[in-house]
Amino acid sequence: MSSKKELLWQSRFSLPFDRDALLFSSSVHVDKKLYREDIQGSIAHVTMLAEEHIVSAEDATQIIAGLREIEVELTDGTLLPHWEDEDIHTVIENRLKEKVGAVAGKLHSGRSRNDQVATDTRLYMRRQITELQEALGGLLKVLVEKAESHRETIIFGYTHLQRAQPISAGHYYLAWFNMFLRDRQRLIDLMKRVNISPLGAAAFAGSTLPLNAERTAVLLGFDDLFSNSIDAVSDRDIVIEFISDCSMIMMHLSRFAEDLILWSSYEFGYLEISDAFATGSSIMPQKKNADIAELVRGKTGRVYGNLMAMLTIMKGLPLSYNRDMQEDKQPLFDSAETTIGSVAIFTKLLEHTKLKEERLAKLTAEDLSLATEIAEYLVRRQIPFRDAHRITGKIVTWSIASNVTLPNIPVEKFREFCEVIDPDIYDSLKADVSVNSKRTHGSCSFDSVALQIEKARKEL
């Protein structure tokens, strides 16, 4: 069965396009999200056409008025795209023809679907990058506030998911701050490559019409315009780079979510997630599940999948444009929406978490994570570090076997392992002393964390 509507390119063919083929190739259900960007680009294009006397000012005025009406109709739902329209660009052009008649056909002068779509994509990405930067800014602000509130709260630092050394909780939050700050910086850098106008490249070789690509670039707020018309329409590297940036953001969120999930469990008990961001069980009444954190962790896989999809779509495509590129929209849209949504909800979740400070103080006071302090104490007594490490390992083994915590080992026992140990070793076996004894740049001491907070605030 053939399709009923005549498509914009149909005149070349002797047979109507097969209905099932149209259904298979239609993208309007996905790219309808671009209607604002498409209308924005069309208004800029026809404005330039009038200024260059390619169309009359009167025709341009009619077209612009019609486009603005269509934007309202698409926004309020009075105009509903149909799959037989092939894509959102066709929806808009057909509706414009209904409104202003044959003059609508002048809109596409000097423009191909190729540079039209490339322009829409860049306009969409520009908006989404800005929104994602703002969402990250909110998360960074909460992290600084958490760091400031818990600058002197002692928690465990981990390696290999094993308690390693006591640290300031503020130091922990600032570690995440720096990761998400780099994520935002990557987006800022990406914007330099996204905010370049491809409009005027036409299909890929340019146009014989006296188009003013510089003018449309200015009208659309682009910082620059394309250098090569083939490149302008035939690559989607910026989409791949954006989804890669989203993947890194989601990776950081997923790792952070994992900590929150573990720390809020009964086995750890370091942190309380607000009831407003937890769910229960349909059968087990006692359960309090960190579902929001788990969903953020789970959605990371979707964004990773989108990145692999885009790399695979573009692999092996000959220059210049190929219809395969139509498949870039779903990974792009889903990655943007998933990442922005995940950052926003995770920020609220984190803001309402509470560290169980009393429990943490008790646990960190007498834990084996103070062992490194013994080794460094011995180094300060001129014991070579490798020997100090070996001696401390034996002390830890005895401590575990004897069920005696490090701060409670008698000095006489310490001296059985190394005779240079004096009673002043107990000064090092306190969690707060351990934290504040750190002297190196960017370390976890309270003073160092205060400096890091001051620096972080300048980035907000």
Curated annotation (Swiss-Prot):
GO biological process: arginine biosynthetic process via ornithine; L-arginine biosynthetic process
Gene3D superfamilies xref list: Fumarase/aspartase (C-terminal domain), Fumarase/aspartase (Central domain), Fumarase/aspartase (N-terminal domain)
UniProt superkingdom: Bacteria
Keywords, in A-Z order: Amino-acid biosynthesis, Arginine biosynthesis, Cytoplasm, Lyase
Cellular component aspect of the GO annotation: cytosol
The keyword Cytoplasm appears for this protein: yes
Top EC class for this record: lyase
Catalyzed reaction equations: 2-(N(omega)-L-arginino)succinate = fumarate + L-arginine
EC number: 4.3.2.1
Single GO MF annotation: argininosuccinate lyase activity
Compartments (UniProt record): Cytoplasm
Pathway: Amino-acid biosynthesis; L-arginine biosynthesis; L-arginine from L-ornithine and carbamoyl phosphate: step 3/3
Keyword Lyase: yes
Pfam families in the record: ASL_C2, Lyase_1
Family: Belongs to the lyase 1 family. Argininosuccinate lyase subfamily.
Protein name: Argininosuccinate lyase
Biological source species: Pelodictyon phaeoclathratiforme (strain DSM 5477 / BU-1)
